[in-house]
């Protein structure tokens, strides 16, 4: 099954997440099919906090990809889909 979820990056105490499309059996930060955005929870006012590619999200959801709870919150916040 294909899922859309967050993959953690960044450094200690400075998380940065990529919104990725991946197989549900792969590891959190392992192989992925496509990167469709990012989420920076510690962004300041000069930096972008969330960016999502709505076209690609809609494509993968139409193909049957399941969206994780955390990504669903980001989508709702951005009103991307």
Swiss-Prot record:
GO molecular function: structural constituent of ribosome
Keyword terms, alphabetized: Ribonucleoprotein, Ribosomal protein
Superkingdom in the source lineage: Bacteria
Pfam families (alphabetical): Ribosomal_S16 (PF00886)
GO CC aspect terms: cytoplasm; small ribosomal subunit
GO biological process: translation
Cystine pairs: none
Record-linked HAMAP family: Ribosomal_bS16
Similarity annotation: Belongs to the bacterial ribosomal protein bS16 family.
Protein name: Small ribosomal subunit protein bS16
Taxonomic classification: Bacteria, Pseudomonadati, Pseudomonadota, Betaproteobacteria, Neisseriales
Gene label: rpsP
């Amino acid at each position: 099954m294909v899922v859309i979820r967050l993959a953690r990056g960044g450094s200690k105490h400075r998380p940065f997440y990529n919104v990725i499309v991946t197989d549900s059996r792969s590891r959190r930060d392992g192989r992925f099919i496509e990167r469709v955005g990012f989420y920076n929870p510690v962004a300041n006012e000069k930096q972008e906090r969330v960016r999502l590619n709505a076209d690609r999200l809609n494509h993968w959801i139409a193909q049957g990809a399941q969206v994780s709870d955390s990504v669903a919150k980001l989508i709702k916040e951005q009103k991307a889909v």
